[in-house]
C-alpha cells in the first residue's frame, strides 16, 4: 500500500507522445513493443557501397538492427520480471494482512474470555483493577505499543518475527485460559458453619443463604457494552475483568461474611478479601492516591486494616453499604480517567485506528441507580398468604344499600315496583332467596369451590331469582322462579310481555312453569305487540285442546317447557291459561271448539290461512278480516292438515264438511320444528288428497321444503286465474268450495301486491335468461366465424396449389406441341438445337424476371417500413395521435395485413389496407407547417399502392 502511494503520478502532466514522454517508464514501452511484432529482414539485398560514399554498409545496418532487437527483448524480459515481482509482493502483503486480522480476532476473543476468569491463586478473587493473569502479564497482554508490522517504514523481514510473536502470545493466552477454567471447575464449596482460615489467621463466620440473598448489593460493574465497541489495542489498556456470574453466586453461598458484600471491586488483596464497605475513609483515600500514582498496566494490591464486620448491626451495615457504593463511584471515575490516559498514549502508535476516541462519558454507572436488593427481598421463612385469602368473589364485592338493591331489570320495571327489603341478599341467576338464618349455596359455573359460610338449599325453600333478561313483573308482583309452586289465591299477577299483544285485558294468564291458578285468582297480562283476539276470548296453549267446561284438562307438553313434569289434572272449576311467548296465534294440534263458543279472530297480519288448521263446527261464527298484509308472517306455511284424533273419533271426522277446512286456527313454529316436521307434512297432504274429491285436489298446496321467507312462500301459492276469479264473482263456477267463495272478495284485492312482486321477479328472471341466451348465441356465432375463416384460408391455399399445377401442365403441353411442330415442319437438322437454345434463353429470362420482381418487392417493403418509421417519429415529434384502424391493437400502427388477426378485415388484404390508408390520409388535416410530414404520409400511401400492384 505504501509502495502504491509512493508511485502516484502527478496530476497535471502534459500530454506528449509515448516516445517523447519522459514520465513513461521503460516497462510500458516494452509492453507496447511486445504488442507490435518485430519485423525481421529476410533475404535482404546487400550491395557494396561505393568507395567514395560516406554511407554505412549494409551489413553494419543489419547488425545494428539485430542488436536493437536483442535490447528490446532484454527490456521486455526485465519488465516481465519486475511485473511478476510486484504481483508477488502484493499477494504476500494481502496474505500477511489477513493473517494479522485473524490473529487480532483470536487475541481479542482470548482477551474477552480472560476478562471473566479468576486469578491463578485460589484464595484471591479477581478484581476489576487487576489483570487476569498477573504472573504472565507481559506474555498475555504484550507491549502497549503496536507491533512493528504496523509501524510505518518497517521492513518485510520484521513481519514474520512479529507473526511468530503473535502466535506465541495467543498460545500463552489459551494455555492460561485452560488453567483458569480447570481451577474454576475444580473449585469446591465450603461446608456450612465452617470458617475459612485466611493468611492473616482471621476466622470469619459464614452467612446463611437467606442473609446473603437479603444483603446482596447491586454490582458496581461498569457497563461493558462500550468496551466491546473499542478497538483491540484499547482493550489492551483496559485490564478490568468482569467477575464470572456463576462463580460469584457460588461465593454468595460459600463465603458467609457479615460485612462482605458481593461487588466487582477495583482492588485486590493477596492475603484475603476484607470488608469493602466497613473500612474507614482514610484507607479509602490512601487507596485512591495509590491508584492514581501507580501506572495503569500494573496490578494494584492493597491491604485493608481494622475490619468492622463483627460489631456492625443490620442497619449500620446497610448505611455503610450505601456509603461504600458512593465511595466506589469516584474510584471508578479515576479508573476511567486512567484508562483514557493509556488510550491517548497508545493512539500515537496506531496507524489503522488513528481516529478512535473512547467515549467514556457515555459509560453509565450502575451504582448511581442501584439499590440493595436485600431491602426488596423477603426471607423465605416469612409465612405466605393462602390462596383462599387472595380470592375475591364477585358476590362479595356487591354493596347492599339500605332500603333498596339495584337490579339489572330496574329500567324495565314499573315505577311502583317493590324492590327487595334490607335483609334480602342479592343472588346470581337461578339461585334462591333464603331468610336470614338460612345458608346460601351459590352456583358458580366457572369455579370449583363454594364460599365458606354457604350451604345447600332444600327443595321446599322459597327462591327469589334475579332475572336479567325479563321485565314482565307487574306493579305489585314479586318474582317467581321457573320451578316455583302455585301462588295463593289472593295474589295478583300482572306480567308485562314486550313481544306479544294478542290477549285481552281481562284474560287469565299462567306463567311458564307455574301450576294452574284457582278460579277466583285475577291474572291480567298486558300484551303490547298484537291485538287480534277479542277481549272475552280465552287463550289456548300450543298442545292443549278446548273441551267443555265440565271436563278435566291435562295439557300435552311436547314442544314447550312451561309446565313442570309433575303437574297433575286440575279441577273442573279452574280456568287454564298457559303462557305462549313464542307464538303469534293459536298453536298447532288445536282441537275444534264446541258449538257454544264464539270465536271472532281479527286476522290483520295475514292474507290467507296457514297450514295445520283443524276443523271447526258448522254453526261456528267465523268472520276473518284480511286487510293489512299481503303475505304470510315469518315461518308461516300454508297447507291443510287433517285433525288429530285425540278427542274425536273416525265417525266425527266423516261428518265434517268440506267448508270446515277453510278457517282453522293459525300456527307458528320455530324454524327447527318446521324442518323436523317436513316428512310428516307430505303424508298429511297425501291423506288430504285421498279424502277430498278430485275436483278439490288443486286447492291442496304441497309443502315447500326450503321455505325461508314469505316472498318465497308467495311463489309457490297456487292462485286462481283471472277467468276463475270472474266465474267465482258471478257464482257460476262449479266445483269451487264454499270457503274459497267466502274469501274471494278479500283475495281479489289482497293478492295484487304479491302478483306485482311476482311479475317483477319474473321479469328479472326473463331478463337474465335472455342475457344468458344471447351470450350462448354469441359464443356459437364466434366459433362458426372462426371456422369459416379457417375454411376460407384452406380453400385459398388449395386454389393456389391447383393453379400452380395447371400452369406447370400447360407449360409441358405447350412444350410438347412445339416439339411436335418442329418435328413436322422443320426438317433442318440444326433447327432442334436452335429451338433448345431459344427455350433455354426464355427460361433464363423468366427466372431473371422472377428474381427482379422479388427484389423489387423487397425494396418496396423496406421502403414502406422506412416510411412508416419516419412518419411515426414525426408524429411523435409533433404530438399527433391517430385513432386505431381496427380492433387488433390500441395504436394506429398496429393495423397491418401481416399482423392482424384472422378475423380482421385487413388480414392478408393489402388492397383494403391501402384503401383505408388513402381514405384516412385524405380525411386527416395535417398542419400547414408540417409539409415534410404531409409528403411522407402521401409517399407512404403511394408506396403501399405500388406494392399492391406488384403483388
UniProtKB/Swiss-Prot annotation:
Classification via PANTHER family? COILED-COIL DOMAIN-CONTAINING PROTEIN 15
The Gene Ontology CC terms held by the record are: centriolar satellite; centriole; centrosome; cytoplasm
Q: Which UniProt keywords apply?
A: Cilium biogenesis/degradation, Coiled coil, Cytoplasm, Cytoskeleton
Instruction: Sum up the protein's function in the record's words.
Output: Plays an important role in primary cilium assembly, maintenance, and length regulation. Interacts with centriole inner scaffold proteins to promote proper centriole size and integrity and assembly of functional cilia. Required for the recruitment of both the inner scaffold protein POC1B and the distal SFI1/CETN2 complex to centrioles.
Q: Tell me where it resides.
A: Cytoplasm, Cytoskeleton, Microtubule organizing center, Centrosome; Cytoplasm, Cytoskeleton, Microtubule organizing center, Centrosome, Centriole; Cytoplasm, Cytoskeleton, Microtubule organizing center, Centrosome, Centriolar satellite
Write the protein's name.
Answer: Coiled-coil domain-containing protein 15
Q: Which GO terms describe its biological process?
A: cilium assembly; positive regulation of centriole elongation
Q: Which cysteines are joined by disulfide bonds?
A: none
Q: Which gene encodes it?
A: CCDC15
Amino acid at each position: 500500500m505504501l509502495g502504491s502511494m509512493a508511485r502516484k503520478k502527478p496530476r497535471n502532466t502534459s500530454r506528449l507522445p509515448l516516445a517523447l514522454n519522459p514520465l513513461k517508464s521503460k516497462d510500458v514501452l516494452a509492453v507496447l513493443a511486445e504488442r507490435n511484432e518485430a519485423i525481421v529482414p529476410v533475404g535482404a539485398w546487400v550491395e557494396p557501397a561505393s568507395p567514395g560514399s560516406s554511407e554505412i554498409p549494409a551489413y553494419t545496418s543489419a547488425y545494428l538492427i539485430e542488436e536493437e532487437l536483442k535490447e528490446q527483448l532484454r527490456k521486455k524480459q526485465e519488465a516481465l520480471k519486475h511485473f511478476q515481482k510486484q504481483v508477488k509482493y502484493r499477494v504476500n502483503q494481502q496474505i500477511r494482512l489477513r493473517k494479522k486480522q485473524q490473529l487480532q480476532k483470536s487475541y481479542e476473543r482470548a482477551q474477552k474470555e480472560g476478562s471473566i476468569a479468576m486469578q491463578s491463586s485460589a484464595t484471591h478473587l479477581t478484581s476489576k483493577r487487576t489483570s487476569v493473569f498477573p504472573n504472565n502479564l507481559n506474555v498475555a497482554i504484550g507491549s502497549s505499543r503496536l507491533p512493528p508490522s504496523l509501524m510505518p517504514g518497517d521492513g518485510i523481514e520484521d513481519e514474520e518475527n512479529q507473526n511468530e510473536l503473535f502466535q506465541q502470545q495467543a498460545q500463552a493466552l489459551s494455555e492460561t485460559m485452560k488453567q483458569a477454567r480447570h481451577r474454576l471447575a475444580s473449585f469446591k464449596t465450603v461446608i456450612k458453619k465452617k470458617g475459612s482460615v485466611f493468611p492473616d489467621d482471621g476466622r470469619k463466620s459464614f452467612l446463611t443463604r437467606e442473609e446473603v440473598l437479603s444483603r446482596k448489593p447491586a454490582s458496581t460493574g461498569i457497563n461493558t457494552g462500550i468496551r466491546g465497541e473499542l478497538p483491540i489495542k484499547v482493550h489492551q489498556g483496559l485490564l478490568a475483568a468482569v467477575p464470572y456470574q456463576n462463580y460469584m453466586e457460588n461465593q454468595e453461598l460459600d463465603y458467609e461474611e457479615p460485612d462482605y458484600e458481593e461487588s466487582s471491586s477495583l482492588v485486590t488483596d493477596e492475603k484475603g478479601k476484607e470488608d469493602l464497605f466497613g473500612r474507614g475513609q482514610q484507607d479509602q483515600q490512601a487507596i485512591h492516591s495509590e491508584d492514581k500514582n501507580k501506572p495503569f498496566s500494573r496490578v494494584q494490591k492493597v491491604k485493608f486494616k481494622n475490619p468492622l464486620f463483627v460489631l456492625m448491626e443490620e442497619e449500620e451495615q446497610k448505611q455503610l453499604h450505601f456509603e461504600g457504593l458512593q465511595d466506589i463511584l469516584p474510584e471508578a471515575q479515576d479508573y476511567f480517567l486512567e484508562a483514557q490516559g493509556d488510550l491517548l498514549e497508545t493512539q500515537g502508535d496506531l496507524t489503522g485506528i488513528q481516529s478512535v476516541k473512547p467515549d467514556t462519558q457515555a459509560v453509565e454507572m450502575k451504582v448511581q441507580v442501584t439499590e440493595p436488593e436485600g431491602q426488596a427481598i423477603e426471607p423465605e421463612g416469612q409465612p405466605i398468604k393462602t390462596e383462599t385469602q387472595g380470592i375475591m368473589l364477585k358476590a362479595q364485592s356487591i354493596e347492599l344499600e339500605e332500603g333498596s338493591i339495584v337490579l339489572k331489570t330496574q329500567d324495565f320495571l314499573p315505577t311502583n315496583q317493590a324492590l327487595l327489603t334490607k335483609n334480602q341478599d342479592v343472588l346470581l341467576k337461578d339461585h334462591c332467596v333464603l331468610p336470614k338464618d338460612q345458608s346460601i349455596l351459590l352456583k358458580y359455573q366457572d369455579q370449583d369451590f363454594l364460599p365458606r359460610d354457604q350451604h345447600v338449599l332444600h327443595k321446599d325453600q322459597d327462591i327469589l331469582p334475579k332475572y336479567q333478561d325479563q321485565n314482565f313483573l307487574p306493579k305489585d308482583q314479586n318474582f317467581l322462579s321457573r320451578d316455583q309452586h302455585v301462588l295463593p289465591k289472593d295474589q295478583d299477577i300482572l306480567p308485562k310481555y314486550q313481544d306479544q299483544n294478542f290477549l285481552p285485558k281481562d284474560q287469565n294468564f299462567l306463567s311458564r312453569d307455574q301450576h294452574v291458578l284457582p278460579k277466583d285468582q285475577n291474572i291480567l297480562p298486558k300484551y303490547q305487540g298484537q291485538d287480534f283476539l277479542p277481549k272475552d276470548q280465552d287463550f289456548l296453549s300450543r298442545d292443549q285442546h278446548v273441551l267443555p267446561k265440565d271436563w278435566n284438562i291435562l295439557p300435552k307438553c311436547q314442544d314447550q317447557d312451561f309446565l313442570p313434569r309433575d303437574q297433575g289434572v286440575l279441577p273442573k272449576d279452574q280456568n287454564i291459561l298457559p303462557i305462549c311467548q313464542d307464538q303469534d296465534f293459536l298453536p298447532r294440534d288445536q282441537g275444534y271448539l264446541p258449538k257454544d263458543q264464539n270465536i271472532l279472530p281479527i286476522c290483520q297480519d295475514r292474507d290467507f290461512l296457514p297450514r295445520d288448521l283443524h276443523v271447526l263446527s258448522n254453526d261456528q261464527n267465523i268472520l276473518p278480516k284480511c286487510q293489512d298484509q299481503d303475505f304470510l308472517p315469518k315461518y308461516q306455511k300454508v297447507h291443510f292438515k287433517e285433525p288429530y284424533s285425540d278427542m274425536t273419533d273416525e265417525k266425527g271426522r266423516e261428518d265434517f264438511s268440506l267448508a270446515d277446512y277453510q278457517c282453522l286456527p293459525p300456527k307458528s313454529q320455530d324454524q327447527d320444528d318446521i324442518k323436523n316436521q317436513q316428512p310428516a307434512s307430505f303424508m298429511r297432504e297425501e291423506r288430504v288428497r285421498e279424502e277430498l274429491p278430485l275436483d278439490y285436489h288443486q286447492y291442496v298446496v304441497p309443502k315447500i321444503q326450503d321455505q325461508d321467507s314469505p316472498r318465497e312462500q308467495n311463489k309457490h301459492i297456487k292462485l286462481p286465474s283471472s277467468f276463475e276469479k270472474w266465474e267465482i264473482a258471478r257464482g257460476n263456477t262449479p266445483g269451487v268450495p264454499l270457503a274459497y267463495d267466502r274469501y274471494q272478495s278479500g283475495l281479489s284485492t289482497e293478492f295484487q301486491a304479491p302478483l306485482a312482486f311476482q311479475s317483477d321477479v319474473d321479469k328479472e328472471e326473463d331478463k337474465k335468461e335472455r342475457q344468458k341466451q344471447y351470450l350462448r348465441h354469441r359464443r356459437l356465432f364466434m366459433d362458426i366465424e372462426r371456422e369459416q375463416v379457417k375454411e376460407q384460408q384452406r380453400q385459398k391455399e388449395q386454389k393456389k396449389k391447383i393453379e400452380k399445377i395447371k400452369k406447370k401442365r400447360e407449360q409441358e403441353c405447350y412444350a410438347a406441341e412445339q416439339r411436335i411442330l418442329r418435328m413436322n415442319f422443320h426438317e433442318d437438322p440444326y433447327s432442334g438445337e436452335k429451338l433448345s437454345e431459344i427455350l433455354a434463353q426464355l427460361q433464363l429470362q423468366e427466372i431473371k424476371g422472377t428474381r427482379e420482381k422479388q427484389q423489387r418487392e423487397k425494396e418496396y417493403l423496406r421502403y414502406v417500413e422506412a416510411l412508416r418509421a419516419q412518419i411515426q417519429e414525426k408524429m411523435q415529434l409533433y404530438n399527433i395521435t391517430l385513432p386505431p384502424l381496427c380492433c387488433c391493437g390500441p395504436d394506429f400502427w398496429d393495423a397491418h395485413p401481416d399482423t392482424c388477426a384472422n378475423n380482421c378485415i385487413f388480414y392478408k388484404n393489402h388492397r383494403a389496407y391501402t384503401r383505408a390508408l388513402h381514405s384516412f390520409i385524405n380525411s386527416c388535416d395535417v398542419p400547414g407547417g408540417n409539409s415534410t410530414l404531409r409528403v411522407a404520409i402521401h409517399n407512404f400511401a403511394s408506396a403501399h399502392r405500388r406494392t399492391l400492384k406488384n403483388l
